[in-house]
């Protein structure tokens, strides 16, 4: 894993190439959450892209073209347009931003002579061929720029036209500040970390994190497994989790993982009690029970107070902490205590804390602890693939130092 991260660290950064009087296309990640009125509820990803954009402004780039996706549109969907982002961008950058409906319109605007201009292209996923990595679309985007900058870590594990494809055909292709910060932070967490190194994994499914868990056992010292995925491990150990969500097909995998952890001397911690309910969506009866005594027909929705105490003690002894995935159904206030408590606990330590996953970041924001974590990754799937020991495809096509 470290060798692959080192390979990705060898990618050239925007500071290593000339951007003055150049046309720069930056693949940013503005895939931010919106409320029902299409207002941005968390602009973290937009703010994280600002240093790269500002660097181009300060170094007098001729034109700056911002390309991003938003959501998963099926064709053109007005509710997923990037046009409403203009005012937020202009306020954050203190600079005019021109919206381009499509590439043809953008090309026409680029032919006009003017001082540094910033263009925001409409949601790239409105264009057919983006997610299929269409070569013609990639060449079209590459033709717009002298320098291509990938600053969208969250999509770097996907071979899409605006990330992987454009980089293949652009004359110069480098990473932005955010991409560099992401890789450097992950490398810091694993390259001679202060030990014990603790990994906390939560979320709904074992299947989504099984590869990660198998690959990371050689690098960690302690492992907390919580969230709905812990139900499968509890059942594998013989506990009756009643109506809780379980991936029965992965029972043997769970047992093999626990055995492997034991052989590698990785201490594994599972919940010892739980907050349960008869109905997670409309809870009428909520109970706290030891995991060996779950109420019939109840579902586990959060970790209980005894688990909180146990996990707190583990966290207090760990100078390096990685966390990916909530500990319960944190979207509902009744079952958010475990995840919120964990966020506060990690924030109160002196540990180097690296946080990944959209649900985890959302929980940390709700807890008001965003500024008290060492590093919060903007990538969900990309973070997982990195931890699984994979080289993210978009790094392969960027220019290397040697």
From Swiss-Prot:
Instruction: Output the Gene Ontology terms for molecular function.
Output: ADP binding; ATP binding; phosphoglycerate kinase activity
Q: Report the principal subcellular site.
A: cytoplasm
EC number(s) in its UniProt entry?
Answer: 2.7.2.3
Recorded hits in PROSITE patterns, A to Z, give: PGLYCERATE_KINASE
Q: Which domain of life is it from?
A: Bacteria
What is its EC class?
transferase
Q: Which UniProt keywords apply?
A: ATP-binding, Cytoplasm, Glycolysis, Kinase, Nucleotide-binding, Transferase
Gene name of this polypeptide: pgk
Residues bound to substrate: 29-31, 45, 69-72, 125, 158
Q: Which reaction does it catalyse?
A: (2R)-3-phosphoglycerate + ATP = (2R)-3-phospho-glyceroyl phosphate + ADP
Q: In which pathway does it act?
A: Carbohydrate degradation; glycolysis; pyruvate from D-glyceraldehyde 3-phosphate: step 2/5
Q: Please name the Gene3D superfamilies in this protein's record.
A: Phosphoglycerate kinase, N-terminal domain
Choose one Gene Ontology CC annotation of this protein and give it: cytosol
Q: What is this protein called?
A: Phosphoglycerate kinase
Q: By its UniProt entry, which SUPFAM superfamilies does this protein fall under?
A: Phosphoglycerate kinase (SSF53748)
Cross-referenced Pfam families: PGK (PF00162)
Instruction: List this protein's GO terms for biological process.
Output: gluconeogenesis; glycolytic process
Starting at the broadest rank, the lineage of the source organism is: Bacteria, Pseudomonadati, Campylobacterota, Epsilonproteobacteria, Campylobacterales
Spans traversing the lipid bilayer: none
State where ATP binds.
209, 331, 357-360
Q: Which organism is it from?
A: Helicobacter pylori (strain ATCC 700392 / 26695) (Campylobacter pylori)
Q: Where in the cell is it found?
A: Cytoplasm
């Amino acid at each position: 894993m470290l060798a692959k991260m080192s390979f990705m660290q060898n990618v050239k950064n925007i500071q290593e190439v000339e951007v003055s009087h150049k046309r720069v296309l930056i693949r940013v990640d503005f895939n931010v959450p919106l409320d029902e009125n299409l207002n941005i509820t968390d602009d973290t990803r937009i703010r994280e892209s600002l240093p790269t954009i500002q660097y181009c402004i300060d170094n007098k780039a001729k034109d700056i073209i911002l390309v991003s996706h938003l959501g998963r549109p099926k064709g053109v969907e007005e509710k997923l347009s990037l046009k409403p982002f203009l005012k937020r961008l202009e306020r954050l950058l203190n600079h005019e931003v021109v919206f381009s409906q499509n590439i043809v319109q953008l090309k026409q605007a680029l032919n006009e002579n003017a001082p540094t201009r910033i263009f925001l292209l409409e949601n790239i996923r409105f264009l057919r061929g983006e997610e299929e990595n269409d070569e013609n679309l990639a060449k079209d985007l590459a033709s717009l720029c002298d320098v291509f900058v990938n600053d969208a870590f969250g999509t770097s594990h996907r071979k899409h036209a605006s990330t992987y494809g454009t980089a293949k055909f652009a004359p110069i292709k480098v990473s932005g500040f955010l991409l560099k910060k992401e890789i450097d932070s992950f490398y810091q967490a694993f390259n001679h970390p202060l030990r014990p190194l603790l990994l906390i994994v939560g979320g709904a499914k074992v299947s989504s994190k099984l590869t990660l868990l198998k690959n990371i056992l050689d690098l960690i010292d302690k492992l907390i497994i919580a969230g709905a995925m812990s139900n499968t491990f509890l059942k594998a150990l013989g506990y009756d989790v009643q109506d809780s969500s379980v991936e029965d097909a992965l029972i043997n995998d769970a047992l093999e993982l626990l055995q492997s952890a034991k052989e590698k001397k990785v201490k594994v911690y599972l919940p010892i009690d739980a907050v349960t309910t008869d109905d997670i969506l409309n809870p009428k009866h909520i109970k706290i029970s030891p995991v060996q005594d779950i109420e019939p027909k109840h579902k586990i929705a959060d970790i209980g107070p005894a688990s909180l105490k146990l996990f707190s003690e583990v966290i207090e002894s760990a100078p390096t902490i990685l966390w990916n995935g909530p500990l319960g159904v944190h979207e509902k206030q009744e079952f958010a205590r475990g995840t919120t408590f964990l966020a506060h606990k990690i924030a109160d330590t002196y540990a180097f804390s690296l946080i990944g996953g959209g649900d985890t970041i959302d929980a940390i924001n709700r807890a008001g602890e965003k500024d008290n974590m060492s590093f919060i990754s903007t990538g969900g799937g990309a973070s997982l693939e990195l931890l699984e020991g994979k080289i993210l495809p978009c790094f392969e096509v960027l220019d290397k130092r040697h």
